From Swiss-Prot:
Residues annotated as transmembrane: none
Protein name per its UniProtKB record: Ribosome-binding factor A
Gene Ontology biological-process entries: maturation of SSU-rRNA; ribosome biogenesis
Cellular location(s): Cytoplasm
Cellular component terms (Gene Ontology): cytosol
Alphabetized UniProt keyword annotations: Cytoplasm, Ribosome biogenesis
GN (gene name): rbfA
Pfam families cross-referenced by the UniProt entry: RBFA (PF02033)
Subunit structure: Monomer. Binds 30S ribosomal subunits, but not 50S ribosomal subunits or 70S ribosomes.
Role of this protein: One of several proteins that assist in the late maturation steps of the functional core of the 30S ribosomal subunit. Associates with free 30S ribosomal subunits (but not with 30S subunits that are part of 70S ribosomes or polysomes). Required for efficient processing of 16S rRNA. May interact with the 5'-terminal helix region of 16S rRNA.
Family affiliation: Belongs to the RbfA family.
Organism encoding this protein: Thermodesulfovibrio yellowstonii (strain ATCC 51303 / DSM 11347 / YP87)
Amino acid sequence: MQPYKRAQRLKVLLKEEVAEIILHKIKDPRLGFITVTDVELSDDLRIAKVFISVLKTEDRQLTLQILNDAKGFVRSEIAKRLRIKIIPTFEFLFDESIDRGFRIDQLLKEIKKTSEEV
């Protein structure tokens, strides 16, 4: 049970620290408003998948490219901030769950509208 608790604590800590690094340390004017929505860790804690959402949907690919190009920098910043034995390798991915949530909301509104018309 203990490794699970450690992994959960590390996941929360990495989410906060990566968000802080993106906000204050990565100085790329092409980056817009980015939210770190989740972090998934591999079982051995060596790989961290960082899920992000971007305010402007047209900037998704560019944002992912910039962040994935800066993942070495993010890793070095994490190494400076945290005292952990293994610093995970980062992979940035777009969080599709937000889009799915909007789509489900749209479908529910359409169903409600259709049922009211009948």
